[in-house]
């Protein structure tokens, strides 16, 4: 169905030449177009962030939301822990973008400088992207992974102090990409990689995770005078990242075939850890199943009395007797629950962590998440990750999400929410390259606000090393120098962080029995992402959507009448596709307006205050009030006009799916060219648009608007710009 929905794309409205439009955060200065007015610094001044009644709250009782980014260092010329000068500059740059939270990712990586790698070597030396492993805190010159680099730790302390000063909170990830070493005393250490799943039950690994958490969260930052466990600028702590033993079980990664010199296809357990887990399972069976049930399970497994009962492979799941299947599911779930309960008690009791604790994120929408929700709901805060056509998964990945609303990232994220728990999206992106990447930020910001979620962290932002970077998009995920996404960040902050789009009026819930959770765990991928037969996939685009409860009486909302466009119950959002083509999302709220998608093919679709007659095939256009007044009475507004973005000289393959040449600096944009209508502006006697460059600085003279019957018309495209500061004279 997804292929059919995406197959029909409109013919090009007109070919628009791409022009240079570089981003330089070091050159950016305070601007009337900034969104830093949304921040309330210093971070933490109102007390600790808490989770209550399904939402995040500040210490003064006001609602808390995150408009955030991950901090990493994959692209060449980047460092996830910036030097002091860069820390000051980038903290200010993030604040200007409206970013009020950062997720500190990969701090547990080695501190050494990794070699540059070319992900596209098989396609040619220019294919790219050219990346290197992020540099973390862990000293790589020692035989173990248990010591911090003092200089890197000082950088981190200063960086967090600068973020705090600018009103930006931090999210600590504990276990992310750590590479354990021989000196750590971990069995099979050379075969573990990042040790996903092993960390749940390997006793040495559990002890090392606690040691790392103690050293990091008990460390006193000399620039703030506070331990991180005591700093209210820390908004949450995540225990593990994209790490689930249940996932390993459901994806056939417990085979026990990872050995030195072996084929080692995909992820897997080593024989040592498989034996350890199997022993734990048999001990569990002895405590939680009757002798008769164990005898039956032995018979099903074909093992004699006295021999350990093995865990099944994924291929056996669909036909497995319920007694055996449910025993394994219950056991694996209990291992996860026990680990997270232990870590939670350690973080709260021994280290004194006061903020919400996240066990792990729902991150694999092509497997059922109902079993994982048992683990997730034991935490304070639910979390999920999603990417539209992730390059590691999709062989073809240059299709518009706006043509496939029922398969969108909104659907894949909404499955992970539950009544009574706050919800964040701590990783999300439309990876580069994509002709349609401009659709992500406005659509996600708008529907996240409709769903009343608590935070969004884009993956990823990377502080640049002075003199070592070039003005180009460095890898699939780095948005730092993407002129389209940087132009859109302040607009998205106003839509989501300020709450320009209203929360849904009605909340529809679904609930699952234990039997349904078991059934979902072995459904085929065709049932993704909800693994809930009969669930209406348009619900999250119309109403609020949550899981009501699990292991309880099942329920499912009744299907809604078919509709195109799909309109939210607030009336502020609509999504139309004309049967899977020419998709367009419309945002129509008092403080923000937007048109996202194939605007030229939908010229009759406008919002109350925004219209467009453009020559571009695809675009994302937003208009947001900068002075807090409704658009029709606002005197200062931010207009963003965004489309395609590429590096100079980039070359696509014959399917226009992947790049055969990553390109070079500078980055180019397709200028949105034509006329933007600003309608129904009360008492306006003049409208002016100041084009801004990639660093939000004025470029060229103001463009004088022309009065037309519906309001005012502004000609855009020359000079090329992705954002404009609108000035209204009344």
Each predicted region: which residue ranges?
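Bacterial N-terminal signal peptides
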Residues: 1-8
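Long, low-hydrophobicity ectodomains and other hydrophilic envelope-associated domains
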Residues: 493-494, 498-691, 709
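Catalytic-core region of carbohydrate-active enzymes that cleave or remodel glycosidic bonds
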Residues: 163, 339-356, 365-388, 398-569
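C-terminal beta-strand-rich structural cap/linker in extracellular carbohydrate-active enzymes
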Residues: 623, 708-730
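N-terminal pre-domain segments of enzymes
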Residues: 14-46
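Surface-exposed loop/edge segments in extracytoplasmic proteins
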Residues: 695-704
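Sec/Tat signal peptide C-region and signal peptidase I cleavage site
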Residues: 9-13
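Active-site mouth of glycoside hydrolases
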Residues: 42-345, 349-379
